[in-house]
Amino acid sequence: MDNDILKRLDPEVFEAIANETKRQTETLELIASENFTSKAVMEACGSVMTNKYAEGYPGKRYYGGCEFVDVAENLARDRAKKLFGCEYVNVQPHSGSSANMAVLFAVLKPGDAIMGLDLSHGGHLTHGSKVNFSGQFFDAHSYGVDKETGIIDMNKVEEMARRVKPKLIITGASAYSQGFDFKAFREVADKVGALLMADIAHPAGLVAAGLSANPMPHCHFVTTTTHKTLRGPRGGMIMMGKDFENPLGLTINTKNGSRVKMMSEVIDAEVMPGIQGGPLMHIIAGKAVAFGEALQPEFKAYAQQIKDNAAAMAAKFLAAGYHIVSGGTKNHLMLLDLRNKNVNGKVAENLLHEAGITVNKNMVPFDDKSPFVTSGIRIGTPAMTTRGMKVAEAEKIVEFIDRVISAANDANVADVCKAVRAEVRELCLGFPLNNYGSLV
């Protein structure tokens, strides 16, 4: 990446970017929601597309001069449709949260009941948390995992649905290492007259590669981020396997009289002008590039390696006496419950940071500690896999983590972290990130 102009004109920002580049280059990124985009994606995101306002949709813009950004957005939409096997897609949401907000506001009224996975059991803020719009505008009810197995009990989900009669049921998670049975959720939704939304922000890349269940045949709406396992720029997206008439009875007047609006029309209007104005066309261009990359055969091999690395790490952790919520992983992440290691999530995160390993503290189901302390850490493999690391490296990384956590309460913990950091740096330099040119 050529940053000579930035270095000369704004050395302070340049220095921040240079230091972040060094951090990414020399340390291990194990946060499950993070990844490294390709140089092509970054070039698109840093292109002249950032200069263009394009309120509206391709062919129906409020501004002139949109003929080329229309090309980029249509490429993104067409590639996403091919990637996920869907009939409708909106690539304009700025984030996964705004994608979720658009769907909820499109199909619900304030006070309507919704159901989603409890945040402390692995869910997401936008699935009904009381500190989020989803729990403030709507009557949110949270289902959870079984205390013994750490897995969602569909019988309890159905019991809750029959009791609260939600208008919308949300599947998906930010810290759940098992899959979702979309068919079973749809059966529950149909029994209570609810719509069903799948938030696949975390496993989207695995879904695209055919290595995780595709929700399109069963869910009315599918939302996702475009980074994480999909390895694109930070952003959001809304999809539907099949378009359908909106169930709210919303109509539109045409030359031939009024008709019921299609759900795609309702969602498009909710994204813009409902909650957003101008889309970020440089990011949409980056999304198009990332979707094109994900359509290549190499991406499926990458996604498989993500799963292989995660499975190897989980097995190694279990062999070392760690407790993994739900007993293992079927995707790209795992949630370690550290209570049997006499260390909390905050301490573990900080010590691992000193050792050059980035993870995030995370609540575990039925946690007795606050979200600022937590009893666990979340670990994911997308970023390390992008570097080219495989099972052997995954197992070595578990050894690094175990050395640090095992020494957490020892007087020499600082020395252990320093020694591990040197080994982590050596490992990372053996799997370089080639996207950043000569910035450092």
UniProtKB/Swiss-Prot annotation:
Any one Pfam family match given in the protein's UniProt record, by short name: SHMT
Gene Ontology biological process: glycine biosynthetic process from serine; tetrahydrofolate interconversion
Post-translational modification N6-(pyridoxal phosphate)lysine, affected residues: K228
UniProt: (6S)-5,6,7,8-tetrahydrofolate binding residues: L119, G123, H124, L125, S370, P371, F372
InterPro entries found in the cross-reference section: PyrdxlP-dep_Trfase, PyrdxlP-dep_Trfase_major, PyrdxlP-dep_Trfase_small, Ser_HO-MeTrfase, Ser_HO-MeTrfase-like, Ser_HO-MeTrfase_PLP_BS, SHMT-like_dom
Compartment annotation: Cytoplasm
Pathway: One-carbon metabolism; tetrahydrofolate interconversion; Amino-acid biosynthesis; glycine biosynthesis; glycine from L-serine: step 1/1
Catalytic activity: (6R)-5,10-methylene-5,6,7,8-tetrahydrofolate + glycine + H2O = (6S)-5,6,7,8-tetrahydrofolate + L-serine
Summary of subunit composition and partner proteins: Homodimer.
Record-given protein name: Serine hydroxymethyltransferase
